Amino acid sequence: MHLIRAAGAVCLAVVLIAGCRFNEDQHQAEGENTAVTQLKSVPYSNFSLRVSYGDGEHNRYEGIYTKNGTQEKAEIQDKLSGVNQEGEEALDEMKMILSELSVTDQMAETEVIHSVLAAFNLDSHYDHIDLKLKLKDGSIREIKK
């Protein structure tokens, strides 16, 4: 009789553990499938970055993000790496970067440039930079060098 109870207890434990494990795997998979566009909040309504490293089209990086109401668009043209992204792919990339970037009205121009280049993993030895961003409070930062 004790043998039957022990076997029953073991079976019950196995079923409970397997069920909990299945539920855990399902929640993890749901988290992995959630798009970045749904997870991150971007503190800018418009963001435009153009950085040139010498002459020619092949030495330029351009990233654009715009938000009108609930409509968001982004585009990335990375001529340095030969990568062009549009649509959801570019939007995910830009939102991931911009949600981590913190630029304020009070920051010095050099600090803003340093923060932006670091966020986009770009070299600080640029020839020209054109940055324009609009914060959610409506203030605009524009830097051209």
UniProtKB/Swiss-Prot annotation:
InterPro entries: YusW. It holds the Pfam family YusW. Residues 67-101 form a coiled coil. Keywords: Coiled coil, Signal. It comes from the Bacteria. Residues 1-29 form the signal peptide. This is Uncharacterized protein YusW. It comes from Bacillus subtilis (strain 168).
